[in-house]
Amino acid sequence: MKLALSFSLLACLGVATGTPISSGAEFAEKEFDYIVVGGGLAGLVVASRLSENSKMRVGVIEAGRFFEDDPLINTPAAVRNRFLQMNATYDWRLSSAPQKHLNNRVIPLPRGKALGGSSAISLLIFNRGSKNEYDAWERLGNHGWNWGGLLPFMKKAERFESVEPIRAAVELGEIPADQGTGGLIAGSYNTFYYEPVFPYRAAAIKAGIPPNYDPDSGVNHGVQNAATSTNRTTGLRSYAANTYYRSAAHRSNLVVLTEAQATKIELEQTKEGLTAKGVSFVHHNKTFTAKAKKEVILSAGTLLTPQLLELSGIGNGEVLKKHGIAPKLELSGVGENYQDHILVSTTYEVKPGVSTYDSINWNATAAAQAQAQYDSKRDGPLTASNSLLSYIDLYHIAGSAKIGYMHRKLWEEVAKEKPTALQKEQYKIQELWLRKKMGNVEVILHPGYFGAGPAKNNTSYISIIMCIQHPFSRGNIHLNSSNPLAPPTIDPNYLSKTIDQQILVESVKFADKIAKTNPLAPMLVTRQDPSPDVKSDEDLNTWVRDNIRTLHHPIGTAAMAPKSLGGVVDEKLKVHGTTNLRVVDASIIPMHLATHLQRTIYGIAEKAAEIIKNDY
């Protein structure tokens, strides 16, 4: 379907009119105090905050373009049609190495290649993890990185203006105190819901998932109607480029260069230690170097930050030498500790007449009506995102005996390996989480088809997506070549721990339990994925291996942890062994969380900006 969008209303937003510059030579000639590598979610937050001081000159190097008036980015529901992810115009189009535990399948790994980064192409869910999960970061040796230390910065980034409708319906009062109301990113709730959404919620509760009316409080266990990053006044996606960048673009001390790829952090050994002096980058096939007087801040993301560190001589010396790069700083944790949320999606055909998102795809009349409603009222189906989700513990999906077997199998496998010091500490924490009422599995209702395909013509579906939140499998990212423009080798090592597969198998069974529960069951015809004849554990194991995908939440490849544990950055986000090189993106997250990541990363970036300001 064609998504049209008039942007005349942008004049009403009160935003600045500055735009990125288009000359690499001009950028390189400027003098900067700070250079931010990567104009994604975190990078734009940091650049915006640092440039609040008019005496500080801030440069941003971004590989993508600024898609200011692009309806595929700005219209919330457009992302469901998968026009953005793995589209080379907007996406790096990265992929995993063949996964040996997935029958050598190669898994697509979308990452936003645009000003705003992945906040420009994400599915917009705007939620938080639990207090226990954030507190675990501090348990790993990162003082001040806990729920209490991060919550004020998450709130600083966000602006809620309305109460979640289900919460309001049970008369639980005003906007919760744990939600921010003065920030730039609009947190809001869908005003349009497809027909199966509320019957699904009732079925999930009957299946044993408790309702949660305050999931932002630090306890996110239960079924909830999550917020999305959507501006309900304009009907537009609210993301880093049209908020943080737009609010700061008029500043003469903030300079953003787009379509430029950083190739190396220029490092020198000084009397203070290894010091970042600038950044080399390629812009329209020419190489330039820009200099930074104070700091270089690396915000290239989980998949590309470790590559740039290694290209600059920071990492495992053996990896660097293999590609002819002289080691400048031995830091074996670079590129390690890769963690991701992996999922399988069960799909169910719904009865004729039941409205889901699929009808917009195959029903021209429904598509035209949705577009007309969006154009006239900035409301309706085109503003709706997936929001009905649950975080559940293992006891929802498996009995005590089966969970006990999972534990024993896990420790048998760990005993045969040589886990890193960081992994040993992580596994101790994760093992405790398996026994707690915590979100070990996320259950997402997608009111449409989200299977491996193909869907039947002129047919509507719902999908129940089951996603592991605390995987035990660990992967890595390292150089594939000394060519800085070549992608790195990304090996997530999915299902290298049997427990991850066991959890997904039991999760499929639980999805079926919800689907067979009233009042949802009467709306469904049959299960399509996996096919109804897939019943035994053996068959389910095969299906899981063949159908695993990722929810696109990679973290951990420049982990914040003490160097003795294999960490890459310290609690001030400085790379161990350097004087002024910091990392600010999801790669610093040491352990995964039961949440979608954008809200946490906004908080990390706000906290990082405060740390940097306080150092000068």
What positions do the PLM features span?
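N-terminal redox-cofactor-binding region of secreted/periplasmic oxidoreductases
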Residues: K2-Y616
